[in-house]
C-alpha cells in the first residue's frame, strides 16, 4: 500500500514540476533566493561590457555566446546574457538562466518598462513589423530627440554595433529591465 502511495506521489510531482519551473515568482518563494530587477549599477556595467564587445569588432554568429576574450562571435541574446554575466561577477546577483533567447528574456526574465523609464543597460525588444514575436534584443543606451540608441549584435551589420531607431518604429516590441536572482 505504501509503495502505491509513493508511486502516485511521484507521478503527481512529475505533472506539476514543469509548471513550477515556469512560474519564477512562485518558484522563488520556495527557493533560497528572491527575484528582483537588476540594480542600476549592474545594468550600467552590462552596457560597458557591450561597448567592449563593440570595440573588439565582435562578429555575429547565430547561437554564439562567446566570452569577451575569445570573441569569435555572438548573437543578440548571447550578447545580452554574456554582458549581464560579466556585470554580476563578484556580486550577489545571478541571471535567472545562462542561456536564453530574446523571446525567453522578454517572457520570463525581464519586467516591462516604458522608454521614458529605461536606463542605460536596460533591454530593447525588437521583432518583425506586424508581429508580436520578439526576435531580437539589444542593450538600451539612451532615448533622445525621439530616437532610441542601443547596442546589439546582428547579422545584417555583421556583429556588435551601435544602432538607433525612431521611438515609434513598429519593430520595437517594448523595453524591459532584466530580472535577476538575489
Tell where the protein language model's regions lie, with residue ranges.
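Sec-dependent N-terminal signal peptides
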Residues: 4-13
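...with weaker cross-activation on analogous glycine-rich loops/strands in unrelated enzymes
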Residues: 24-25, 35-47, 89-162
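Generic detection of short hydrophobic beta-strand segments and adjacent strand-loop junctions
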Residues: 163-167
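Low-complexity, Gly/Ser/Thr/Pro-rich intrinsically disordered linker/tail segments
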Residues: 170-182
Amino acid at each position: 500500500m505504501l509503495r502505491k502511495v509513493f508511486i502516485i506521489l511521484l507521478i503527481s510531482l512529475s505533472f506539476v514540476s514543469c509548471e513550477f519551473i515556469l512560474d519564477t515568482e512562485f518558484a522563488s518563494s520556495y527557493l533560497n533566493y528572491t527575484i528582483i530587477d537588476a540594480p542600476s549599477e549592474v545594468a550600467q556595467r552590462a552596457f560597458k561590457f557591450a561597448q567592449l564587445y563593440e570595440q573588439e569588432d565582435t562578429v555575429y554568429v547565430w547561437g554564439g555566446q562567446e566570452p569577451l576574450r575569445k570573441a569569435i562571435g555572438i548573437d543578440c541574446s548571447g550578447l545580452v546574457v554574456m554582458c549581464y554575466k560579466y556585470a554580476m561577477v563578484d556580486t550577489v546577483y545571478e541571471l535567472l538562466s545562462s542561456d536564453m533567447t530574446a523571446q525567453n528574456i522578454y517572457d520570463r526574465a525581464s519586467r516591462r518598462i516604458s522608454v521614458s523609464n529605461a536606463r542605460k543597460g536596460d533591454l530593447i525588444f525588437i521583432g518583425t513589423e506586424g508581429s508580436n514575436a520578439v526576435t531580437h534584443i539589444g542593450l538600451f543606451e539612451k532615448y533622445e530627440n525621439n530616437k532610441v540608441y542601443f547596442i546589439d549584435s546582428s547579422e545584417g551589420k555583421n556583429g556588435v554595433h551601435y544602432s538607433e531607431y525612431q521611438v515609434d518604429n513598429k519593430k520595437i516590441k517594448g523595453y524591459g529591465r532584466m530580472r535577476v536572482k538575489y
